[in-house]
Amino acid sequence: MHEASIVAGIMRIVEEEAARHDVTRIARVRLRVGLLTGVEPRTLTACFELYSEGTVAEGASLDLETVPALGTCHACGATFDLHRRCFACPTCGNDDITLEGGRELTIAGLEVPQPEGATA
């Protein structure tokens, strides 16, 4: 379960960024997670809930944006979705491809709560 170590790293960054901006509470953490990372969303969310206890992110929501796995064929130039985890070009069948997406795991944003009485 590598999700625990991933969340530990995320929480370190969240705490550092909150301190850097004098923020005492984070309301939402947005992550971009590529399909090829092997990250299990439910496990990641459960680890986040556990690791965020007692931190500036306690009670924060975790929003996950799935990044598709894309490939580009060197033979014909086609760009295609690797959702089947088939690493051959569906246009020409060539397996000389470059992965263009799907390995990302990044913090896309941190949101702070609205101040009491503030309007959106």
Curated annotation (Swiss-Prot):
Ni(2+) binds at H2. It comes from Nitratidesulfovibrio vulgaris (strain ATCC 29579 / DSM 644 / CCUG 34227 / NCIMB 8303 / VKM B-1760 / Hildenborough). Involved in the maturation of [NiFe] hydrogenases. Required for nickel insertion into the metal center of the hydrogenase. One of its GO terms (molecular function) is zinc ion binding. GO terms for biological process: protein maturation; protein modification process. The lineage of its organism: Bacteria, Pseudomonadati, Thermodesulfobacteriota, Desulfovibrionia, Desulfovibrionales. HAMAP family: HypA_HybF (MF_00213). Transmembrane segments: none annotated. It comes from the Bacteria. Belongs to the HypA/HybF family. Pfam families: HypA. Keywords: Metal-binding, Nickel, Zinc. This is Hydrogenase maturation factor HypA 2. Zn(2+) binds at C73, C76, C89, C92.
